[in-house]
Amino acid sequence: MSGMKRRYDYEEEDGYRDFRPRYSKRQRLPPVVQLCKDMLPDIRTIGESVKAFEEDIKFLSEAIINEFGNDEYFNNALLSTFNALILEQPHKQPAIALLTIVVNSGNPAAGKSVINYFYEKLQHLLDMTVVDDFEVTSNETGPWNKIKLTLRFLSLLSPVITLTELTNVYQRLFELAVQLNRSSDANTRNPLSEAIYTNTLLNIPYLFFFNKEDETLRTNVEDLIQYAESNYEVKTVDLSLTKEYNKNLPYEPVQWVQIVLSNVKNALANDMEELKNLFPDYQNLLPTSIEQQMFNDPLTIPEFEKLLPFSGLDKGLGSVDSMWKTPRTAFQVYLPNVVGDFSTVVPITTYTGMLFDDIIVDIVESLEFNRHEVARQVVTLDLYFKPGIFTEPGLSIAQLLVQHNEMPELSTYKIEDLAIENILGLIFKLPTVTQSFAYFYTLLVEICQNSPKAIAPVFGRAFRLFYNNLDNMDHELKMRYLDWFSIQMSNFNFSWKWNEWEQDSIAFSKSFYNPKITFAKNLIRKELRLTSNRPDVEDSLTPEFKQYLDASYISKDQLASYYQSFFEGFSFDPEVIKDNDLLFKNEVFPFHEKVQLILDYIHKQPLEKNISELESLLEDIKSAHGDKIPDFNRFTVTLLIQALVYSGNRSLSHANKYISDAKSDLVTILEKMEVPPEVKEQWIIEAVIRYWNCNSQNGFLIVDSFKHSELVTAKSILTFSLTDLNGQNLGLVDATSIESTFRTLTELALQQASDISVFEFVFERLLEIINDTVSQLGTNEEIVAPSVDNETMLDVDELARLDLIWKYESAVGFIKSILRKYSDEYSVLLDKFSAGLEQAVPHEPTRKQLDQWFNEIREL
């Protein structure tokens, strides 16, 4: 706001008379509207200029002191702006609180109005916690998260609010947390209890922001902490289902509820040394005389009995509230002592680190509607805290190493690392994400575009951590990592240092199930799908990785065998098989002219079609060439399906049109075949995927269209994906197939009456794969892939055995993901699964793992 005109007087001068002729002109805004239009943007950006902060507080407070109470429009606009900042940009709360304290000294009625407004907001939010039809929008963080933020703001106002009233709110929230915690047995956590306990403790240091020397406040806070410590029993619940890594975790998971008390106590210890190094000192801006205010009415906490049904936080109350449904853990990417003998992010085991994580998550979640603002705010968070917490923005790791060696007393914490780590934590959150992946991915792209030199290396270090831990990473998270990596690369010219991974490719390129090889293959294929200019991807690869440029779902030899399997006594040159083309219309086939007539028929308008014409064409082919086509039913289905797909290959909507138009004819022809429905459906799916062999993502999406037209079932799609082909199971490793499986199950889960038998089928099919793999390995011991040095030369037998172990881990990891992701559906099947587990799974270590997951499902 520095340098702006500071006058907010829009009233015309007394006695001014204008005798000029009147001309038509744009209507002037009312003075109060113009005032708001000029002043509120300055409030929204308060603190963004450190140099202008003191001047901003002075002029804004003067304007509010003079204007508040004169017009309802101004009052409402100001309070709404305050509320938006407090909930959406909590790092600006101290600035708004300071503004309020200064205003209170010059206009106590205005100060009282602000306090009452937020106290009433607090009461309203508490009332909303027991409302069944609570309305949730995409940026709704939840009533309990908003209670946290509203109480934090009121805590900042401790100099102007009667302390007993303020600390009484804390006491009552702690009592509620304790009561909820005691409502369940010693081994069962209460999600809401943990949220209230953690959030309330996290707010306590804000009571001292402007009020560090108040002895009464210190005594009251000591009593509060003593009560929480003595009465709240922290319950340790370890859910392996929601762990990001299946084994060899790169860091020890830390739950927020386990560390918040010690973090707060340490922050208040040693005469609040940590807080003095964290919070900026605004004492010189505080007014000399302060008038204290009281709340209008006692706070009403919802009755325990009414609140208990909502305490699982599983009723869709908001994005941040829902994060407490399962134990809230700290996600770590930039681990200490990796790049040097220091850390680049503030440890979560400090109050400072925990608070920064909390604020960044709140900004990302509550400002979801304004991605550009989020991208700007999360990397400038350091401006609102004490200088020196973070190192200079954009400092490279090499520069940081030099600085640390020369001046070890300087901070090594990077605000970029902290922001990116928290956003990645939201992307990799299990069991569910809080926003669409598109929002998180594009947010990261924008942050990088705003400052590529500073952010690109931060991304690179995250890429490397995830890649190095692919062997251990959760199955579903591998897919999220793949998506994020591919989107980042496609937005930055597909640039990556592929040479870093070359040794892995040299060592394991012959493996089918090695996690790093499957990742590289899927990544390159995904990049090819994301660009219309193939050379962009090709040119970015080193020679070692160009072997993975073939994006085919199955090999050319397998595809040729598929087409040749339709004929006996007739063969063709495999070279005639072309991508995205209808093979059977090629002139090498004696019936190609009839195929062209079938295509002509498909292109006719629905009212012009007569199925007898189509049947006649098929009969002509059978009469003339049936002796060379042993299974004419299979051939007919494949020909018609591929002809449809070929006709609609310009776009998915185009394909949908042709499928819809041809549905009646297809049903008529299929019904006349004396073949089991599931066999015909496999023919349909295989025909589509083989046609789109060069782009199986398109193939699976078009298969979905056949499903929506009720020509194939969800179970048939899953059967196809999870069936071995020549001893290999693409459904475990190919990204497009895995995406199809998750998409199919998710669509089923969203239906009001989902078909549980399909979920049962997928589980049982994966068990079959596991049992078969264990049998081939011939072991009763626990199966864990050894850490294999990529410099080691493996013979054929060693690699084959390793591949079986990786296959086993892929299938077990897949089961872990579907049990977690579709826990509601699988919870119905738990008794059945448990009863038959010993017979269904001979391998005891696998059986124990599944039994553990069955028990954990009840916690999700």
UniProtKB/Swiss-Prot annotation:
Disulfide bonds: none annotated. This is Nuclear cap-binding protein complex subunit 1. It is found in: Nucleus. Belongs to the NCBP1 family. Keywords: mRNA capping, mRNA processing, mRNA splicing, mRNA transport, Nucleus, Ribosome biogenesis, RNA-binding, rRNA processing, Transport. Gene3D superfamilies: 1.25.40.180. One of its GO terms (biological process) is mRNA transcription by RNA polymerase II. Component of the cap-binding complex (CBC) involved in the nuclear export of capped U snRNAs. The CBC complex is required for efficient pre-mRNA splicing through efficient commitment complex and spliceosome formation; and involved in rRNA processing at sites A0, A1 and A2. Component of the nuclear cap-binding complex (CBC).
